[in-house]
A protein has these predicted regions:
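Conserved core architecture of multi-subunit DNA-directed RNA polymerases
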Residues: 1-357
C-alpha cells in the first residue's frame, strides 16, 4: 500500500482559507501517483477485469465499489474521499478558465522582456497599490498602459514595440490562439505609405509555450503591482504543464445492469482518456526524427488544446462540440452551472449535510 495519504482522528483549528490558483507544482505534489512520476500513462480503463494500474481508474485515486480497498489510504468507498492524480503534458496548453486573465496580463507587460510597461515609481502606481487590490488593480494597470506604444528603456525595458493582444479561435482547425498584432513597418523608404501592404499589421502567434515563458519571467515585484501575490500563486500557473485528474469518486464507473458486459465510464473519464491519447500522440511526435512530421507539430498541439478546452466547457466555446458515440460529452462546467448543477441542485438544497461538503 502506498503511504501517500494517512487519515487520523486528530483535529486542528482552521485559521483561514486562501483561494489561489492550483499551480502545476501543487498538482504534482498532491498527486497520489507520486510527485516524481509522469503521472497517468495508460488510457485503457481495465486490465482484463481489474482497474488498470497507471490508468484513469487506478485504485490509488480511490475506489467506487464496496468490495475494493483504496491503494492509497486502505479505506473502502464509504470512507475513502478519493485522491487526485496528474498527467504531465508534452507541451503547455491554455487553461480556458484563466484565458481572459492571461490576455489581460499580457496587455500589461512586454512580450519580449516581461517587464511591466508602466513606470513603477509614478505617483499613480503608488496610489494604486494603496487603494486597489487583486482584479481591480489589474484593470487599473490595463487602463494606464493603453497609451504606451514601446517598452520604455528609461523604465529598464527593451524598447520593443507594444502589440495589440487578441484571442483567436478557429472552428475549422479547432485552434485556440493568442495573437500579438504589431503596427506595420514601412521598410522601403521609396514605397508609397498608402499602399495596401503597409496597412497590414504584423501578426505573431503567441503559443502556450511562449506565453508560459513570458509569464514565468515576470518579476515578483511586478506581480504584486498586477494584483498577484507571488508567494501564493504565480502567473505561469494559469498555463497547464501538469493536468489535474480528479479522484475516482468524483467520476464513478456505473454498471448499467447485470446483463451489461462491463461498467460504463463517466463522461469526465472519457474526456480524460481523449486528453491522454492526444498527449501521448504529441509526445511520440516530438521524439520522432522524421523532418516531414515537423509541419504537423502545431496540429498535434491544437488537438491536445481542443480536448483540454472541451473537458472544461463543451457548450459555450466557439469550437466543435466533443461527442462520444453521437452524444455530447458533459463537461466540468455543465456539472456545476444551472438549476440542475452541483451548486444549486446539491449544495444549496435543503437536505445538504454540510459537514460532508
Amino acid at each position: 500500500m502506498l503511504n501517500a495519504h494517512r487519515y487520523n482522528e486528530k483535529t486542528a483549528s482552521i485559521s483561514r482559507i486562501d483561494f489561489t490558483i492550483l499551480g502545476n507544482k501543487e498538482i504534482k505534489y498532491t498527486s497520489a501517483l507520486g510527485k516524481n512520476t509522469p503521472g497517468l500513462l495508460k488510457y485503457e480503463f481495465y486490465d482484463n477485469t481489474e482497474p488498470q494500474k497507471g490508468g484513469l481508474i487506478d485504485q490509488r485515486m480511490g475506489v467506487t465499489s464496496n468490495d475494493l480497498e483504496c491503494r492509497t489510504c486502505g479505506l473502502d468507498s464509504n470512507f475513502c474521499p478519493g485522491h487526485s492524480g496528474h498527467i504531465t503534458l508534452a507541451q503547455p496548453v491554455f487553461h480556458l478558465g484563466y484565458f481572459e486573465h492571461v490576455i489581460s496580463i499580457l496587455k500589461c507587460v512586454c512580450t519580449k522582456c516581461s517587464k511591466l510597461l508602466v513606470y513603477k515609481n509614478e505617483e499613480d502606481i503608488i496610489e494604486l497599490l494603496k487603494s486597489k487590490k487583486g482584479k481591480n488593480r489589474l484593470n487599473e494597470i490595463k487602463n494606464l498602459v493603453k497609451s504606451i506604444s514601446y517598452c520604455q528603456k528609461a523604465n529598464y525595458g527593451c524598447g520593443n514595440p507594444v502589440p495589440k493582444i487578441k484571442a483567436e479561435k478557429k472552428k475549422a482547425t479547432i485552434e485556440i490562439n493568442i495573437v500579438a498584432e504589431y503596427a506595420p513597418l514601412n521598410q522601403n523608404q521609396n514605397q508609397n505609405p498608402t499602399d495596401e501592404i503597409d496597412k497590414k499589421p504584423i501578426k505573431e502567434i503567441l503559443t502556450p509555450m511562449i506565453v508560459y515563458n513570458i509569464l514565468k519571467n515576470i518579476s515578483d515585484r511586478d506581480c504584486l503591482i498586477l494584483g498577484i501575490d507571488p508567494t501564493k500563486s504565480r502567473p505561469e500557473d494559469m498555463i497547464h504543464t501538469e493536468f489535474f485528474v480528479p479522484p475516482n469518486p468524483v467520476r464513478p464507473s456505473v454498471r448499467a445492469d447485470f446483463m451489461s458486459s462491463g461498467p460504463r465510464e463517466d463522461h469526465l473519464t472519457i474526456k480524460l482518456a481523449d486528453i491522454l491519447k492526444a498527449n501521448q500522440r504529441l509526445a511520440k511526435h516530438m521524439e520522432s526524427d522524421d523532418k516531414n512530421l515537423i509541419e504537423y507539430f502545431q496540429d498535434h498541439v491544437a488537438y491536445l488544446q481542443y480536448h483540454v478546452a472541451t473537458y472544461y466547457d463543451n457548450e459555450s466555446l466557439k469550437l466543435p462540440q466533443s461527442e462520444q458515440k453521437g452524444v455530447m460529452t458533459k463537461s466540468l462546467v455543465s456539472r456545476l452551472k444551472g438549476k440542475e448543477g452541483r451548486i444549486r441542485n446539491n449544495l444549496m438544497g435543503n437536505q445538504t449535510l454540510w459537514e460532508r461538503v
